[in-house]
Regions:
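Mixed-charge, low-complexity intrinsically disordered regions
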Residues: 1-84, 88-208
Length: 208
């Protein structure tokens, strides 16, 4: 009788082990491995240049100069959003434009141009280079920090580029005040170092 009970116990243990192995195999077949993320996807690349990092109080290091972000303009055209950051630290008015267009992060270093006598046209020549109109439109804007603009309003723009895309122009009209011209050049993220802005009042991590 004792030997019979031992045999029954061994059989039960073997059946239990077989059941565990089969369940583990089924779980392995049904499980979906975690997918790896594209390191150059817009949400990955843009995080260092997004509104959480770039804003009033942030530092942008470029060409051996540390520029302080004095103010930020957030622009909305339908569902499309982009930012313009006023920089203090160099000669003249410098702006850093940031947008994600069709999944690609685009950064532009803009310089305000005065005394040029230019107005929007199909082609605009500046610095002996021909710029052709690339796009135009209108947007709503809101401001944070010091920008020289009202807290919110409307603007129009007409953007230009050279054939090789190395030189850009932008005419902007803020609330009907007249066209202002800026010249720009595309930047790569690796050319700049961003030291994040302090948290805004009421945001997580803010300290009075």
């Amino acid at each position: 009788m004792g030997e019979f009970l031992i045999v029954i116990g061994v059989v039960i243990v073997i059946v239990a082990i077989i059941g565990l192995v089969l369940n583990a195999r089924r779980a392995g077949k049904n499980s979906v491995p975690g997918s790896r993320r594209d390191p150059l996807a817009s949400d990955q690349v843009a995080q260092g240049f997004g509104p959480r990092n770039l804003g009033p109080g942030a530092i942008v290091a470029y060409g051996g100069i540390d520029y302080v972000v004095r103010g930020t303009i957030t622009l909305h055209q339908g569902s499309f959003v982009w930012w313009e950051h006023l920089l203090d630290g160099g000669d003249g008015a410098q702006w850093l434009g940031v947008e994600v267009d069709e999944g690609q992060l685009e950064i532009t270093w803009w310089t305000t141009r005065r005394g040029h006598g230019l107005v929007p046209a199909p082609e605009v020549v500046l610095d002996d280079r021909v710029h052709r109109e690339d796009e135009s439109g209108a947007a709503q804007y809101s401001c944070e920090g010091t920008t020289g603009l009202p807290p919110q309003g409307q603007m129009r723009y007409r953007d230009y580029r050279t054939q090789d895309g190395s030189s850009l122009l932008s005419f902007e009209d803020w609330d009907g005040s007249g066209w202002e011209l800026s010249s720009g050049r595309p930047m790569s993220p690796g050319e700049l170092t961003v030291y994040p802005a302090p948290p805004a009042p009421g945001a997580p991590g803010y300290r009075a």
